[in-house]
């Protein structure tokens, strides 16, 4: 082959190898960049989820804020500016109330006496505590009356249990003017009595304007349609997964997260209104709650009530008893010697009488009035 031809072939081969090397270099560079990004992302995730320290969470959901973060939390200036003078004052009062409650370490766990009360009375062990300072009153344990125009709320005496999968209760709006704002939900204790549920930490509520609030002192988020007089609002609590849902006239709404702390049924209002709470003492509007028995406790307690000592018992006449016993004496009894003459007289010290069992009955005793004592005639005894 001619040398010129050989030179041309070599030039063609070298020109063909240069593009291949460039493509190979590009692939190697891309692979290196991808590996570097993966390593960097792995390091970031490793540092984020393995680093020890205090976790600071926002107040988006109940229970997602620790006590130290609550103390160090800064006021949302933008939301605070949207409040009126009364709202700003209430917000600052509620914040001070929460900080004082956090420092006092109030124990809200259910006590043994509470469990015994639930076993004995069933669902009737729950009742709402009146808030008379803000003109909030309770009738028949579950009929709530808000008489003032101030913001206030009422809570039950016992928290919801954590044994069953779901606990449910309903609130019927009996008399609610148009300009009254009602908030129904769950909250922890101690909770500011001058605030609605959902406005402060560790509380969630469905508001009558159609919004829902979870630790939202400034604004609420759209949730469902508004409710008014005649509607029935239900609250369902799932303690196993810390979730809460609401119902409106028997129709279920979306679920929301809630805190792991002890929660109490809480109802609040701004303005006069009358509400009735069904904790399970009657049937629900929500059919599923009736079928699955989601009431707070059995309608009837499992323990028998103690005997009543206040009722008066029938008077026992010992004269009639002695006469009947004397009439049934046998012939053998009449032949026995008479020992009544040797019987000692009844013991009586300072007007105090003793019965056969040794029980004391003073003249001023209430038992003496219920069980009148009579002198027993002498009879033949062995």
From Swiss-Prot:
It is found in: Cytoplasm; Membrane. GO terms for cellular component: cytoplasm; endoplasmic reticulum; membrane. Keywords: Cytoplasm, Membrane, Transmembrane, Transmembrane helix. Residues 79-284 form the B30.2/SPRY domain. Residues 304-382 are annotated as: Disordered. The keyword Membrane applies. Its main location: cytoplasm. The chain crosses the membrane at residues 21-41. Residues 309-334, 361-372 have a biased composition (Polar residues). InterPro entries: B30.2/SPRY, B30.2/SPRY_sf, ConA-like_dom_sf, SPRY_dom, SPRY_Ssh4-like, Ubq-SigPath_Reg. One of its GO terms (biological process) is protein transport to vacuole involved in ubiquitin-dependent protein catabolic process via the multivesicular body sorting pathway. CDD domains: SPRY_SSH4_like. Pfam families: SPRY. It is a single-pass membrane protein. PANTHER family: RAN BINDING PROTEIN 9-RELATED. This is SPRY domain-containing protein C285.10c. It comes from Schizosaccharomyces pombe (strain 972 / ATCC 24843) (Fission yeast).
